[in-house]
Structures are given as C-alpha cells and as structure tokens.
Design a protein with these regions (language model features):
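Class I S-adenosyl-L-methionine
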Residues: 1-33, 38-131, 139
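Beta-strand/loop-alpha-helix module characteristic of Rossmann-like adenine-cofactor folds
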Residues: 2-23, 100, 119, 126-129, ...
Length: 194
C-alpha cells in the first residue's frame, strides 16, 4: 500500500521543499507505532527534520529517512523545552528551506498546543499542514471496550484536562451529575482531587 500512495506524496513534498520550507504537524496517535495514520507515516518518510515530543513512540522515528535531523523537544512534568523554544526551532528549520515534521503525541489539537505552533509559523509567513492523529481520548476507551456513547446510555461525551485551567478547578460535582461520559486526559497527578 505504501508504494501506491507514496510516490505522489514524495513528489508534492519535493516541490515544496525546493522553494520555502514547510512544517507538517503530525499527530502520532495514542502510543503504538502502528496507530499513526498512513498520511502521518508518509509525511515522516519525506522529512528533512523531525521535531518530536516525548509522548510519541520512538519507533515512529524509524519511518523518517536515516539522514533526517531528529530534535527531541519532549516535555516532562515541571521541565523541558518551552513552547517559545519549540516555535523558534520550527521557524528556524522551515526558514532554512527544510521539510519539517512536528511529531506530536495523540492529536495536535487535543491539548497539544498545535494552534500556538501554527500561529508562530504564520507570523513568519511559513505554511503549515495538519495531519490529525488518533487521540487517546477516543483510543483508550475503545481499546478497553468502553463505548463513549451508546443507545440507551450516554448520548454525548466530554473530554477535559485533569489539570487546573487558569488557576480554576473544574466543577467536578456538576460534571459528575451529567449524563455525558467523561474522558479525563492528563489526570494521573490530580486524580485524588477529581
């Protein structure tokens, strides 16, 4: 299957790389290297530079060319590279004409700061493509056999972070009264207060 879809993607990436560099935000999926989308894998296969998170499966880096530059900008609780530093790395390499893949755990727009990276790139006139990833908000319940919605049960679901937002806690009591299924991401540390 890769041969069928690979050639047009490589040609398009080559045409872009010959002029101004670009950035592709690729959602790596929920953890396993086999859970990235085909389009995400194809973007990695044509990357000059891969800027990756700590949450992305390390095996995904094998999908990039051996001569690609790999830059880990992984964040851990309380430490790591700042968002401004990540933005600067993306701008620097794209401005130099490189084809940059920004590999992000899960989906770039589900607590992934993808919009901040796009805004920083746009401020420098750099185009950006987004390739969605499978979010753990959907994958974890599915892999555990837990339906987020079902006939006669929950008709909706809510995804939220377990962390405080703007120094305010969620109204957990109100959320608990809802008939909606709740999916709490990044909830391990604050679990005792949820």
């Amino acid at each position: 299957m890769t041969d069928i879809v690979d050639a047009p993607h490589r040609r398009a990436a080559g045409e872009v790389a010959s002029s101004v560099g670009t950035v592709v935000l690729v959602g790596a999926g929920p953890g396993g290297s086999d859970l990235i989308t085909v389009r995400g894998a194809l973007a990695l296969a044509t990357a000059d530079v891969v800027v990756h998170d700590r949450l992305a499966d390390a095996e995904l880096l094998d999908l990039a060319p051996a001569d690609a530059e790999f830059i880990c900008v992984g964040k851990a609780k309380g430490s790591g590279v700042t968002q401004d530093e990540i933005n600067a790395v993306l701008v620097e390499h794209a401005s130099a004409g490189s084809s940059v893949v920004r590999l992000k755990g899960g989906d770039p727009f589900v607590f992934g700061r993808g919009s901040e990276e796009i805004e920083a790139l746009a401020a420098h006139g750099i185009s950006c493509e987004v390739i969605p990833g499978v979010s753990s908000a959907l994958a974890a319940p599915a892999l555990a056999g837990i339906p987020l919605t079902e006939r006669g049960g929950a008709a909706s679901f809510t995804v939220l972070t377990g962390h405080r937002v703007d120094d305010h806690d969620h109204d957990w009591s109100a959320l608990a009264r809802s008939s909606s299924t709740l999916v709490v991401l990044m909830g391990a540390s604050p679990a005792s207060s949820i």
